[in-house]
Each structure stands twice: as C-alpha cells, then as structure tokens.
Amino acid sequence: SDMAVLVKMNMRDGFRGGMELDETMQVARRLEQSGAHALVLSGGFVSKAPMYVMRGEMPIRSMTHYMTCWWLKYGVRMVGKWMIPSVPFKEAYFLEDALKFRAALKIPLVYVGGLVSRDKIDEVLDDGFEAVQMARALLNEPGFVNRMRAEENARCNCRHSNYCIARMYSIEMACHQHLKAVSYTHLTLPTSDL
C-alpha cells in the first residue's frame, strides 16, 4: 500500500527514571530497520514533566479553572508553581538532541520543538531534517506558513505563556492573544492569569 508510517517518539522523557538518549537511539534504530518511513523527534512526558515538553510559563490559575475536582483545583493553585516550575523558552529547544539522531540515522526525520521563526526553520532544514512540525506557532497565527513564504524574517507572535495548553482539554484550544472573555451560557472562561 501507499501508506506512510511516521513514528513520533521521545528522545528523552525529561524526568528521572525516564528514557534517555542511549535508550531512545536504540528504539530509533529498530524503527529504521523495521521500515518506518520517518521519525518525528519529540521529548517529554506531559503528566510527569510537562514543562520539558512545552517550555515557557505555566498558567496555574487558568489551568485549574478547568479542573472539576474542587480539592485538586485548590491544591494545585496553592502549590502548583512549585509542582510545575516554568522552564525558559528557547527556540528549537530539542535541536541539540535531534542533531545526534540526524548524525546516527539515515531515515527521514521530522523536527518538532519550539519553532516560531522562518530563520530557525530554515536552519533546522539546512541541518538535514526532512520536515518540521509546528503547533503553537500555528495556533497563534494560522496563516504563519503563508506569511513565511512572503517574508524572509517572519516570526510568529507566540509569547510561550501556555494559556493554550491550559485550555487544551476544555471547550476549545485557542491562543489567548486572540480571545476576549468568552461566555458559554453561564460560564465565563479566563483568558489570562492577570
């Protein structure tokens, strides 16, 4: 059949006891030998190390707004900043590890992790990655790909505040920069922690 098989895999899990590069490189080699068409290189484990995946700030108040269990909501509001510390955003934050996979494998690789500018995307592609995957940049600016075609120095305006992540398992995933307080019958959803 003409179906492409892409496997999204962690390079590191981002927490003590999780998988590290030496283990995941073995997995990648096995997937390459097994005939996968491409690997999408990611990292992190949302329930154990959420900021390893997301980077930036964690909007605790907005995140807890969607929790239905009252005691969990208030507990996370009280100690959440210590439970889920912020990790500074750096564009292409998985690139250093991904380059090790690029050097060791022949299989096509898709880079994912903090791409918000055409300059960095061009750099990643020049480093030998066959494709890139974006999420928050496109959530922030759905027309970003078209703007990159028109502007050499295009950069999206994502602020890495992660309000979109706080909304992810609720009514809709959306960039808070484009929302006003949205009312759904009796419910008003926060658009920021300020």
Question: Where on the chain are the PLM-derived regions?
Answer:
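Glycine-enriched alpha-helix->loop->beta-strand junction motifs that scaffold or abut catalytic
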Residues: 34-36, 105-107, 126-132
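Glycine-rich phosphate-binding active-site loops on the catalytic face of alpha/beta enzymes
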Residues: 128-147
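Alpha/beta enzyme core
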Residues: 1-95, 104
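Conserved small/polar residues in nucleotide/adenosyl-binding loops
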Residues: 185-191
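Hydrophobic faces of well-ordered beta-strands that scaffold small-molecule active sites
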Residues: 5-7, 39-41, 109-112, 132-134
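Short cysteine clusters
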Residues: 158-164, 175
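Catalytic cores of alpha/beta
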Residues: 116-128
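Glycine-rich beta-to-alpha transition loops that act as phosphate-gripper elements at the mouths
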Residues: 8-12, 108-119
